[in-house]
């Protein structure tokens, strides 16, 4: 997986070094995030590249829906390496709401009561991932987990609930990818395009926030 991603990212860096302005920036969300970040640093240590995972921000969005507030009103303390991380504190307009969230997540996972979900994370496997957080939160009381902790701590359950004949990759190709490719085909054919098919949810918002900063 990592080897499949590293070479194209290094190639992209080389293209930018050759063709882009010296002030270029690459905002990279490719996975596996930690491996790609380490590889690009070792192979191209002077590259102007930000290797980022948006999952903590996606979880913040769900926290905001659970609390009934705007995501930007939350302030969080988070530590860890990319997907392997924990929220130690969550504050809403300065008020500590960590314990309230712990109680909720231990019972419901990161699924809001209305089950509203970001279009980028609305596939069945994502909904299962958000719900799985309740098991981790119940077992580890000190902090709120990143959803990816399920792969480290609930490995057997993840394997048992997986369908080898219809994986998360199939969900992406049949859902998000198909919506975008169909919209592009409609645009090229001169048809009216539903721009919401290009909406990236919190993932897209975070990319814009990083680029603007």
Regions found by a protein language model. Give the residues of each.
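Catalytic cores of large soluble enzymes that bind and process phosphate-bearing ligands
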Residues: 1-8, 51, 55, 202
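Rossmann-fold NAD(P)-binding glycine/threonine-rich loop
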Residues: 1-44
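A structural micro-motif
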Residues: 24, 47-48, 74
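A structural signal for short, well-ordered beta-strand segments and their strand-loop junctions
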Residues: 26-29, 51-52, 78
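Flexible loop/turn segments at secondary-structure boundaries
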Residues: 33-37, 59, 85
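Short acidic, glycine/serine/threonine-rich loops at helix termini
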Residues: 38-42, 62-63, 88-90
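Acidic, His- and aromatic-enriched active-site or binding-groove loops in soluble protein domains
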Residues: 46-63, 67
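Long, compositionally biased stretches enriched for glycine and/or charged residues
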Residues: 65-213
């Amino acid at each position: 997986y990592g080897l499949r991603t590293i070479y194209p990212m290094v190639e992209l860096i080389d293209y930018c070094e050759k063709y882009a302005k010296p002030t270029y920036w690459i905002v990279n969300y490719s996975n596996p995030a930690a491996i790609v970040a380490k590889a690009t640093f070792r192979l191209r240590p002077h590259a102007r590249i930000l290797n980022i995972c948006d999952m903590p921000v996606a979880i913040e969005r769900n926290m905001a829906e659970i609390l009934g507030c705007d995501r930007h009103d939350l302030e969080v303390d988070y530590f860890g390496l990319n997907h392997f991380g924990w929220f130690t504190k969550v504050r809403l307009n300065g008020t500590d709401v960590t314990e309230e969230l712990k109680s909720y997540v231990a019972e419901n996972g990161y699924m809001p009561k209305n089950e509203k979900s970001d279009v980028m994370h609305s596939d069945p496997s994502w909904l299962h991932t958000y719900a799985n957080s309740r098991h981790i939160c119940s077992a580890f009381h000190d902090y709120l987990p990143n959803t990816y902790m399920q792969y480290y701590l609930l490995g057997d359950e993840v394997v048992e609930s997986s369908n080898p004949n219809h994986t998360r990759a199939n969900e992406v190709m049949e859902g998000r990818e198909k919506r975008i490719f169909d919209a592009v085909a409609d645009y090229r054919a001169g048809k009216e395009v539903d721009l919401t098919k290009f909406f990236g949810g919190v993932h897209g918002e975070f990319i814009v926030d990083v680029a603007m900063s």
